[in-house]
Design a protein with these regions (language model features):
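Conserved, mostly hydrophobic/aromatic
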Residues: 123, 298, 363, 475
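Short helix-loop-beta junction
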Residues: 1-10
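Conserved SAM/AdoMet-binding glycine-rich loop
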Residues: 17-18, 368-483
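Flexible loop/turn segments at secondary-structure boundaries
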Residues: 19-20, 42-44, 97-101, 133-135, ...
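Conserved alpha-helical substructure of the radical SAM core
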Residues: 351-379
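Glycine-rich beta-alpha loop elements in corrinoid/cobalamin-binding modules
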Residues: 14-276, 283, 288
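Glycine- and acidic
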Residues: 59-64, 99, 120, 279-281, ...
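N-terminal pre-triad scaffold of radical SAM enzymes
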Residues: 3, 315-346, 379, 472
Length: 483
């Protein structure tokens, strides 16, 4: 829908038959690129249990029938596209691409795998929530660039086999930002920030090459060069160094992930480089967070809340549709991002720690439209996001300097600067409850209850218990065990 709103035509090929390259030719060769995702869940998580046993069903496939999505779906899909159309642009994105963008431990094979950008042989990878990146990339493709030539967009990873390309980064810090004025997105000028000196991720064996002279570090941006980003150039441990099972290799793997985790904020993240054999994977800094106005505009686009019609034609065992849709069809996304820092969770790596939220009017309008759906029974299943009760940034400092690299907002010793308030969320829930034909508004996203307990105003807790629990309170599971 976002691409359509910018004048691009999009054909959706839903869950193609990966065993038959001709199934990727249904719509012909795209003018600009194939945009490939494995869906809302990593394909290995979708296909296997934690005990490495095949799952009996796939809630994201037609009729819930298993076997319609391949293992390591992105790599398989890209390979099939390459067979069907040699030389076409292929860009990967979504949760599987985001979480596997560098060398990563793969639970199912019990090995460290290379970046999925290299394994899949795609041309470009979009990580995180890709609205800004995809519009900028589409515009550059329209202007005649190939996907392999696009190296200056936030929220993307690219690769090269030339050391000279890596060396050239030291002389090129002009990051290009999407100009999406048609959606009231900020222009590149609005997205520029002056960067001040800060502690970097310097470690003994891995160099951090400054892309600017130290004496220039505190200068304000030149008004004629508003996209000039003062970034550093950090070399991660190479794939060769992290792939083995030795203690030294594991330490370097942990170090690599630490550096990656410290560079998930759009304001203070640096450019990360990982060498694999003779190639280099380069991660540009994350896309800038969306403003409330931008979030509202995106969620006002004409989404249907229905599965792709192709799934009706592929009905399995007399069943059609996507079972997973029933859980979210009448839910509202009120926010993105999370500063909870749960050690097991990948949200920060995908959406970042900054909270991006929609306005009350936007959510009320969407809820009102839902009440007119013939399948709506009066129940809004969820109003939330990664963490339901986060509606604003953790502190004012995040808006200026980004989330702290070496300090968590919550945890055993919460930061004293965390602003605790549920007032905005309470007012939003009250407005949603008052909409005609709405019987109940439930919260099924996780409640971060240590944050809740920090709030001296108990209004939200009272409202939560009286109006918004559908059987059991949903909480973040990292708090249930003292160990």
């Amino acid at each position: 829908r976002l691409l359509e709103s910018h004048g691009f035509s999009v054909a959706i090929l839903a869950q193609p038959d990966w065993k038959n390259p001709d199934s990727f030719k249904i719509f012909g060769k795209p003018r600009l690129a194939f945009l490939v995702s494995s869906g809302a869940m990593d394909s290995m998580v979708s296909n296997y249990t934690a005990n490495n046993k095949p799952r009996s069903e796939d809630a994201y496939a037609h009729g819930g029938e298993k076997g319609h999505r391949p293992d390591r779906a992105l790599t398989t899909y890209v390979g099939a596209i390459r067979q069907a159309y040699k030389g076409t642009n292929i860009i990967i994105g979504g949760i599987e691409a985001s979480l596997r963008r560098f060398s990563h431990y793969d639970y199912w094979s019990n090995t460290v795998k290379r970046s999925i950008l290299l394994d899949s042989k795609a041309d470009l990878l979009i990580y995180g929530m890709g609205e800004r990146a995809i519009i900028e990339i589409a515009n550059q493709l329209k202007d005649g660039k190939s996907a392999r030539e696009i190296r200056n967009v936030r929220g993307t990873c690219w690769y090269t086999g030339k050391e000279s390309d890596i060396a050239a980064l030291q002389n090129s810090t002009n990051m290009s930002f999407p100009d999406t004025a048609n959606l009231s997105f900020p222009t590149s000028t609005d997205l520029s920030f002056p960067y001040s000196t800060r502690e970097s991720c310097e470690h003994k064996d891995y160099r951090v090459d400054p892309l600017i002279k130290p004496e220039d570090d505190n200068e304000l941006l030149d008004s004629d060069n508003d996209t000039f980003d003062k970034k550093q150039f950090i070399h991660l441990p190479s794939f060769e160094e992290v792939k083995n099972n030795s203690p030294e290799s594991k330490q370097k793997y942990a170090l690599s992930y630490l550096i990656q985790e410290q560079n998930t904020d759009a304001i203070n993240a640096d450019i990360l480089i990982e060498k694999t054999d003779s190639r280099f994977v380069v991660q540009n800094p994350p896309a800038m967070p969306l403003s409330t106005e931008e979030m509202d505009k995106i969620y006002s686009l004409p989404f249907t809340r229905k599965w792709h019609p192709m799934y009706d034609k592929l009905a399995a065992n007399g069943k059609s549709g996507i079972p997973a849709l029933s859980e979210v069809k009448f839910s509202l996304t009120s926010c993105r991002g999370c500063f909870g820092a749960c050690s097991f969770c990948a949200i920060t790596f995908h959406q970042g720690r900054r909270i991006q939220s929609r306005s009350h009017n936007s959510l009320v309008e969407e809820a009102t439209k839902m009440t007119k759906d013939k399948d709506f029974k009066g129940y809004i299943h969820d109003v939330g996001g990664p963490t339901a009760n986060f509606r604003n940034d953790a502190c004012e400092n995040q808006k200026i300097n980004g989330a702290c690299k070496n300090k968590d907002c919550l945890g055993v010793n919460p930061c004293k600067n965390v602003k605790v308030s549920h007032t905005d969320y309470v007012e939003l829930l009250q407005k949603l409850r008052s909409i005609p034909n709405v019987k109940k508004v439930f919260i099924r996203s996780g409640i971060r209850f240590d944050y809740l307990m920090m709030d001296k105003d108990k209004t939200f807790f009272t409202e939560l218990c009286k109006h918004h629990i559908s059987g059991q309170l949903k909480v973040a599971p990292e708090h249930v065990n003292d160990n």
